Amino acid sequence: MIRQERSTSYQELSEELVQVVENSELADEQDKETVRVQGPGILPGLDSESASSSIRFSKACLKNVFSVLLIFIYLLLMAVAVFLVYRTITDFREKLKHPVMSVSYKEVDRYDAPGIALYPGQAQLLSCKHHYEVIPPLTSPGQPGDMNCTTQRINYTDPFSNQTVKSALIVQGPREVKKRELVFLQFRLNKSSEDFSAIDYLLFSSFQEFLQSPNRVGFMQACESAYSSWKFSGGFRTWVKMSLVKTKEEDGREAVEFRQETSVVNYIDQRPAAKKSAQLFFVVFEWKDPFIQKVQDIVTANPWNTIALLCGAFLALFKAAEFAKLSIKWMIKIRKRYLKRRGQATSHIS
């Protein structure tokens, strides 16, 4: 019985030893397979790990370099956007300070009859007549003729000198510009103590406004203060071609100005010698063309365009700042990840 028990115990021990050997062989084979996968030895494995870490390092460096370049580019774009904002605001302020003059023309069929204020002094009005296109030849120069003009006489104090009283003859001017209506006036000056003889005149915008004015004296003083005066000489026929200019002031009021072109023709005096002592004056008033010139200052600065440019510039600034912020965070994250992997590789090698 004792031998039988010993034989069974030996058999169990031998079976356990066989299992241990088999397990050790399997472990050795697994180690060999792992060694085969990793490489022929320990040193080649370390070389591959160092090579992969160097590749990762080079990629990280390239990414960091490109990130820095992008940050500089966006900083440059931010500087350009700031400069554009500054220039936009500066240009807008300059355009507000210096408006551009705009000139337009309005065609009319007829004008309001202008007022012609004449200051003949000692000269006598011989004739005043409306004609169309052509002035007929003079029949009796130096003698009183037809008076078919609407005239008014007024005396008022000179607005520039309170001691001088001026006497003005107000004549209704032409209206029908398309029919080439004109007004022909003839004056005679018998005697004059002056070396040169001339008659002053000024033009104002509306003869009807003068008639309807409750204070005609003040009206004429205001006209003389606002409008320029001209002269026409004796012994000539002075042809005045008028044009009207309306200027819009900054406060919204509209100022009226007359511009004129004059042509002077010598009068061939064929009167007897006894009558030539009296000086004759001839003047013609006519509209130059049917166009009223309108002048106004226009501010070319458009606030909506400026606002749109500013919004675009500020949007570019915010986007650039946001991208720079994200790029910096990404660089910090990549740096931390690289340091972490490097520490893990060092601990694994050790």
Curated annotation (Swiss-Prot):
GO MF annotation terms: pH-gated chloride channel activity
Entry keywords, A to Z: Cell membrane, Chloride, Chloride channel, Glycoprotein, Ion channel, Ion transport, Membrane, Phosphoprotein, Transmembrane, Transmembrane helix, Transport
GO BP terms in the entry: chloride transport
Pfam families: TMEM206
Keyword Transmembrane helix: yes
Localization annotation: Cell membrane
Tissue distribution of the protein: Widely expressed, with highest expression in brain.
Membrane-crossing segments per the record: 65-85, 302-318
Cellular-component GO terms for this entry: cell surface; chloride channel complex; plasma membrane
Processing after translation: N-glycosylated.
Membrane topology, Extracellular segments: 86-301
Regions annotated as coiled coil: none
Glycosylation sites (chain numbering): 155, 162
Residue positions, PTM Phosphoserine: 9, 14, 24
Membrane topology: Multi-pass membrane protein
Reactions catalysed according to its record: chloride(in) = chloride(out)
Cytoplasmic side of membrane: 1-64, 319-350
Highest taxon of the lineage: Eukaryota
Record PTM Phosphotyrosine, positions in chain: 10
Similarity annotation: Belongs to the proton-activated chloride channel family.
Entries under PANTHER family matching the protein: PROTON-ACTIVATED CHLORIDE CHANNEL (PTHR16087:SF0), TRANSMEMBRANE PROTEIN 206 (PTHR16087)
Main function: Chloride channel gated by pH that facilitates the entry of chloride ions into cells upon exposure to extracellular acidic pH. Involved in acidosis-induced cell death by mediating chloride influx and subsequent cell swelling.
Protein name in the entry: Proton-activated chloride channel
Organism: Homo sapiens
